[in-house]
Amino acid sequence: MTTTSKNCLTLTSIAAAVAAVLVLSACGGGSAGENINRKPTYLGTVVSVNYDGASDDLLTAGLGKTGLGATAPVAADPLNPTAAELRRIAIFNNYRALLDISVAGGYGSLYGPNVDASGVITTSEGKIAGTEYMAYSDDGTGNQNITMLVQVPTTFNPASPCIVTGTSSGSRGVYGAIGTSGEWGLKNGCAVAYTDKGTGTGIHDLQNDTVNLQRGERATATAAGKASNFTASLTSTERAAFNTATPNRFAVKHAHSQQNTEKDWGKWTLQAVEFAYFVLNENYGDAAKDGVSRLVKLKPANTIVIASSASNGAGAALAAAELDTKGLITGVAVAEPQIQVVPDTRLSVRRGASTLGGTGRSLFDYASLGNLLQPCAALASPTTNVFNTVNTTIATNRCNALQASGLIVGNTTAELAADAMARLLAAGHQPESSVLQASHYSFATPAVAVTFANSYGRFSVKDNLCGFSFAATGAAGSATPNAPVAASAAALATSFGASNGIPPTVGINIVNNNSVGGPLLDAASLSAGSVLDYNIAGALCLRELLGGSSANALKVQQGINEVLRTGDLQGKPALIVHGRADAQVPVAFSSRPYFGRNKIVEGANSRLSYIEVTNAQHFDAFLAFPGYGERFVPAHRYFIQAMDMMYANLKTGAALPASQVVRTVPRGLTGAVVNPITPANVPPIKTVPAVADQITFANNVVTVAD
């Protein structure tokens, strides 16, 4: 291994056919009057890897379009995967987690690595050569360690520069937006500025005291030190006591960092853009007079920057645009943003005969409500539920427990279930999402409720908030079914590549510490009287945190207040696309009120358009599940179009579309087989929609076409 230095690039060569790892640092002082490119002070060591676009690449990690649609890559030594192997596994899983990877669903025709930037289907595997730069953003303590990543394709043109943000969706790691804004940016020759926003795969195995490093390898917390992605804030004495009381548990960064990182998602997104500018100017800036430094050549005045991503990453993009005091962001194009709006009683949103006043509900409000009601509501329409894995007996017990708590009414289970569903609809869920309540409870809602409660309240893992903890659990046929057990060493070793950042993930589950007889897997735990009811006490405890007066509740409420956004995009052009049937981030709680609040605060200066898509929901990857594909279309198709339209506007002045409802056509079935998707199923966004499809704002009222 040799080290040389040139133009602030310290090059560490590795004997590998496909990559050279670089360590990038600011150096040189420059001369008076020169605008020297300087590394932001919050950035740590920058590690860079070159990819040839054949054996390995930026978009597919060498897998190509075919490999992303095939079986998952594995490490040669599952217990000791290399950083390169972990990266490949991460890109494979994160790409597929956001998209439907079925040919019939549009992969390879509407989207995918082989579909070029103009939408033309090619025979290419879609591999993209370029260089990738990774670093932590931190305040010097090692407690933040927000992972930042910049990808610069070889097609980047410094004469026509562009940057796209790729803040991770959900609680995902730094590659979380690879298939959404990452793919769009790389195909269009833009640098992509990613960040895990302080969530990601920071998993601290408290029993064995091991943690993730920046590139995914695992080490002891002691050996990792400040290089750890996340180490729980426990003294050795506290950790020993915790392990004695609750063995085999895990602390996870999003839940247990005690920083309420969501309040800073906009900040981290802006820092990712600044990181991208630093990298680009190190590569393309002219040499300074000292012969070592580089001058700032690319800057907001000559570079297009689109803040983008989906879900939580989309909310981060909007937050970044609100916070942008340096003019870093030129425009915004996002999909299904998880965005929470400051209260404003002036606003109301109308769709048909339904009117909701105010600016919607907070994430924890609708997550904790769904966590209570969804299992019972799943029984309201059992024949039409999509991919329903809710246990009927346990759900019936949940209905009875809700009735005993005075939260629903009815004389039969059917009536109780109908009332639970009615209360979800009255809260603001769209009727189109009713068939999804069951599957969302099974796959998403409890995870969101538990993790975000911990995050908002800045709770430590040792607090065991509402009796919840995270652990691997025994298989049904094992000696200790559903009880906490030691986790799989192989699953932990590859957690950087396979984890979504929010338990249940990589075999780490949500555990009810208060289960009768001892801790058990939450869904299988026993309530008072040894009743299986999906842990009603835990669900009620979480709900109390929203509006209660306990010390824990006040902490959570403070944290929620810290993440509310104003709707002020400072007049930046912006596009939001959102599926009407979204049951994870319902439109009535997010995009609709955000659109209205933006119109109130910006008035005539607002350049935000809102696109609501019928027959689209939150998780395109779920389109592969039974019942989803025939009912719903890929929202990703409209994300791509929104990005195309925003780029055209910023580059050529092309008109942005007016706010509208796009009316799609479900694929349906032929016999038991879902029909292949065609362009007729997903008509394009119109620049000027028909009157019957318009979304309008007047007199503080958002009116959404029914």
UniProtKB/Swiss-Prot annotation:
Belongs to the D-(-)-3-hydroxybutyrate oligomer hydrolase family. GO terms for molecular function: hydroxybutyrate-dimer hydrolase activity. Its EC number is 3.1.1.22. GO terms for cellular component: extracellular space. This is D-(-)-3-hydroxybutyrate oligomer hydrolase. It catalyses: (3R)-hydroxybutanoate dimer + H2O = 2 (R)-3-hydroxybutanoate + H(+). The keyword Iron does not apply. Pathway: Lipid metabolism; butanoate metabolism. It comes from the Bacteria. The keyword Hydrolase applies. It is an enzyme of class 3 (hydrolase). One of its GO terms (biological process) is butyrate metabolic process. It is found in: Secreted. The active site is at residue 311. InterPro entries: OHBut_olig_hydro_put. Keywords: Hydrolase, Secreted, Signal. Its main location: secreted. Participates in the degradation of poly-3-hydroxybutyrate (PHB). It works downstream of poly(3-hydroxybutyrate) depolymerase, hydrolyzing D(-)-3-hydroxybutyrate oligomers of various length (3HB-oligomers) into 3HB-monomers. Residues 1-32 form the signal peptide. Pfam families: 3HBOH.
